[in-house]
A protein has these predicted regions:
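Append "and, occasionally, other polyanion-binding protein interfaces
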Residues: 1-69, 76-85
Length: 85
């Protein structure tokens, strides 16, 4: 099964231009591939509801960091629900 790459997600969501920023930010904060994918999907949802009015890159940085944290929480919650103690 051929899964989409991280680049594919950024291309489909229209954020390919900020991929280097996203990777650097995620690496500095210690997030993994799965959390990045979940976060970019959440960023795209927010972009569709509340697009930036001025500085798209600054907006992306702020929202992506927020969504990375949400993604980690969602993934941990899913794993906890899947594997109860």
């Amino acid at each position: 099964m051929n899964l989409p790459s991280l680049e594919d997600y950024f291309i489909k969501t229209g954020f390919y231009d900020v991929l280097p920023l996203a990777l650097k930010l995620a690496e500095n904060l210690g997030f993994d591939h799965h959390e990045i994918i979940e976060a970019i999907c959440k960023v795209n949802d927010k972009f569709n509801q509340y697009p930036p009015t001025k500085n798209r890159t600054a907006w992306f940085r702020m929202v992506f960091e927020e969504k990375l944290k949400e993604s980690r929480a969602d993934i941990l919650a899913f794993k906890a629900k899947k594997d109860p103690l």
